[in-house]
Design a protein with these regions (language model features):
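Bacterial N-terminal signal peptides that target proteins for export
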Residues: 1-9
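Intrinsically disordered, low-complexity segments
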Residues: 12-13
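C-terminal motif of bacterial Sec signal peptides marking the signal peptidase cleavage site
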Residues: 16-19
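Non-catalytic macromolecular-recognition regions in eukaryotic signaling proteins
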Residues: 21-208
């Protein structure tokens, strides 16, 4: 599982959307979605990682209490309509984002190595680490609720129904070091959502 960022109060926020009793009935496994969360990159060069953390406000929450029609439409699109079970509050509140991420492209402002010139894609040497609810829901709610993945970005990983329960969406892991490990690099991460929205953030990356 990827290194988790700071928990941002998601559990307490989604706790407020349901009954205060010990359990409640739900047709949907995903309890809510966050619309276009604000992105922040945090570098952990000693682990060759950059973590994509996020934050949001109450207007970005889509659930059975906020924007009900959209929540139902998203649930239907994701085929998350037949969970039909009692849920216990202490089991947690699965949360994802809306819309899904279509692609992630990583570039560097300098020459990373002999195969990667300035501003060229680094996707062939970077793995994205994330967790998703998609298999659990598509299988009819069988198996592991949330599965973790580590996939080369150039292989176009499926980022649907990504886990957003904690404070981070995903981490990118460099599989090789830059030619000059003492240099400082500005790494840009461009996220494209399936609705065409693009968000890019840049973070300094220096191993030594």
């Amino acid at each position: 599982m990827m290194r988790q960022g700071k928990i941002l109060g998601l559990c307490s926020l989604f706790f407020c959307i349901v009954s205060c009793g010990p359990s409640y009935y739900s047709d949907h496994f995903i309890t809510g979605y966050i619309s276009h969360p604000e992105i922040n990159l945090v570098s952990f060069p000693e682990e060759r990682l950059i973590v994509c953390e996020f934050k949001y406000n109450s207007t970005q929450v889509i659930n059975s209490d906020n924007n009900v029609a959209l929540y139902e439409a998203i649930s239907e699109k994701n085929m998350d309509v037949s969970y039909c079970r009692e849920r216990r509050h202490w089991e947690g509140f699965p949360v994802s984002i809306f819309p899904d991420i279509e692609s992630v492209i990583v570039t560097c402002d300098g020459v990373y190595d002999q195969d990667h010139n300035s501003n060229s894609s680094l996707n062939d040497i970077i793995k994205i680490r994330y967790s998703s609810y998609e298999n659990y829901i598509s299988s009819g709610y069988k198996g592991e609720e949330c599965e973790s993945y580590s996939v080369l970005l150039e292989d176009n990983p499926d980022l649907n129904l990504i886990d957003a329960t904690g404070g981070s969406l995903f981490a990118i892991e460099f599989t090789s070091n830059p030619s000059d490990i003492s240099a400082s690099y500005n790494i840009k991460v461009l996220i494209t959502y399936i609705d065409g929205t693009k968000i890019s953030r840049t973070v300094e990356y220096r191993i030594f």
